[in-house]
């Protein structure tokens, strides 16, 4: 399970260090793609295969399903970590998530997310202001 928040710098070549505890869960190959809220989603290969099967079950006749699947898959990239534990983030994904120098890598259960630090701070501030209401409407601790 992915959890925690880690800040790392994106280097000049577009490489980002993935936290050691996440590397253990990712194995040799994983997939990154466009995520919700302007971040990048990252999935271990096994979870990606499950998600792929779910997306394959969406009805081709629905315009919104076609648009979502097309947009989601178009930016997907199969990745491997280098010897320093870095992943190369493709330019299209860096642009989509507005990644600059500082990035935040966040664990979210079965996936991880990559955010630009400024965008993450904005999301965190907005969400913190509504956290009690979100919890009340979604889950009983």
UniProtKB/Swiss-Prot annotation:
Alphabetized SUPFAM superfamilies for the sequence: AbrB/MazE/MraZ-like
Keywords, comma-separated and alphabetical: Cytoplasm, DNA-binding, Repeat, Transcription, Transcription regulation
UniProt keyword Transcription present: yes
Domain of life: Bacteria
Gene3D superfamilies found in the cross-reference section: Transcriptional regulator MraZ domain (3.40.1550.20)
A GO BP annotation: negative regulation of DNA-templated transcription initiation
GO cellular component, one term: nucleoid
Record-stated family: Belongs to the MraZ family.
Record protein name field: Transcriptional regulator MraZ
